[in-house]
Amino acid sequence: KFLEYYGFVGDEPMPLYSVAFEHIEFLKSGEKSRLIGKLFDLAKNAIWDADAPNYLQKAVIELILIFPDEILSLLKEEDNKIVESFWYFILYYPSLGAEYDLGYQKRYQQLYFCISEKDKLMGEVVKGIYNRIIVESR
């Protein structure tokens, strides 16, 4: 649904494409308990793309780093397929050679340490998805 409003299909922008960044910033300014759930729901089955999905990815990463317990609580309610889909979207990097990009590595390390400190098993899931993305980017 997210891309139906904020995405791009072929050469055509969707109705809210031009305001995607502002809308995500507005969402981030809301009440955190409601915001976490809404952004989590958007990210569960999201697929990375430039612009709006990228803005969403960055917003959710910020929330994970600030509210890891809340995100982990939501993830524990989901099945493994959704958990993997969520982390794949969060960790995805659209470039060959992701393993050599220091900014990407730093972001992964921040997420990994933040999550594994709270939940070792989920930290291993994060590590596994990261390694899969690295292999796929070669």
Which ranges hold each PLM region?
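Extended alpha-helical scaffolding segments
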Residues: 33-38, 44, 48-138
